[in-house]
Amino acid sequence: MNIENKEITSSWFTNLRDLLCKEFEKIEEEYAQTKGLKPAKFVRSSWQRNGGGGGVMSLMKGAVFEKVGVNISTVFGKISPEFRNEIPGVELDGKFFATGISLVAHLKSPLIPAMHFNTRYIETSKSWFGGGGDLTPFYPEKNETVKFHAAFKEACDKYDSSYYPKFKKQCDEYFYLKHRKEPRGVGGIFYDYLNNGNFEQDFAFTQDVGKALLSVYPEIVRSKLFLPWTAEQKEYQLIRRGRYVEFNLLYDRGTKFGLMTDGNVEAILMSLPPEVKFN
């Protein structure tokens, strides 16, 4: 396994975590100042994995972000034999290394979309990058959806014109609730097992995906920061959040990978919304 690759990827995910947390705290401050509130801050807690490695959870519950979590982790060791068929390159000895960042934002306002983002680097006897970002509005708006997709398309097009249509399609297919026959949101991009034989290029692309998210999502949040909403709209948001829960518990690869590798349960389930209704 390549030690330098491990270090620079892990360092980037930590840096991106800091940039995202800083920007989200800034949004909370902007809102709090106009409402006479004390701005919320992220609370961090670290955890260690028994088999090797660990991570840091950053969680904020505020007036804008009802719950936003930004997790980073770097874990390594051996995967249990019963799970070795599910991850490429661990079939023989089970050894793995994984580092990444995961972000989920649930907003108080039903007019502001929820958002999920993650990027990761994994080494077994093979190595690859994966990740992406997707938007889940409760009241979709075309301009907003176009803006979100355009940010990721720009990042993709720097590297390969085939990336965006391919990764968009993969996102649409991945974030689909088969049992309900409906998409979870308005999509974005999703990629996995990315290894073009050029680590530097694949890593640069993964960094640009993170930068795209950092540029577009805060802009979307700010555009609706002070819009009024009704109790009926909030009720609808809580019901639709149920779809989020269903997907994460039934289909999400990150949830499954975390549980298979004996990750921190609180960090793995951080993506779940703080309040939800099932009718």
From Swiss-Prot:
Q: Name what cofactor the protein needs.
A: a divalent metal cation
Q: Which domain of life is it from?
A: Bacteria
Binding-site residues for substrate, renumbered to this chain: 102, 118-120
A GO MF label: coproporphyrinogen oxidase activity
Catalyzed reaction equations: coproporphyrinogen III + O2 + 2 H(+) = protoporphyrinogen IX + 2 CO2 + 2 H2O
What's a GO cellular component annotated to this UniProt protein?
A: cytoplasm
Broad enzyme group: oxidoreductase
Q: What is its EC number?
A: 1.3.3.3
Pathway field: Porphyrin-containing compound metabolism; protoporphyrin-IX biosynthesis; protoporphyrinogen-IX from coproporphyrinogen-III (O2 route): step 1/1
Report the main location listed first in the record: cytoplasm
Job of this protein? Involved in the heme biosynthesis. Catalyzes the aerobic oxidative decarboxylation of propionate groups of rings A and B of coproporphyrinogen-III to yield the vinyl groups in protoporphyrinogen-IX.
User: PANTHER family from the entry?
Assistant: COPROPORPHYRINOGEN III OXIDASE, MITOCHONDRIAL, OXYGEN-DEPENDENT COPROPORPHYRINOGEN-III OXIDASE, MITOCHONDRIAL
Q: How does it assemble?
A: Homodimer.
Protein name as it appears in the record: Oxygen-dependent coproporphyrinogen-III oxidase
Q: Which organism is it from?
A: Rickettsia peacockii (strain Rustic)
Print the organism lineage: Bacteria, Pseudomonadati, Pseudomonadota, Alphaproteobacteria, Rickettsiales
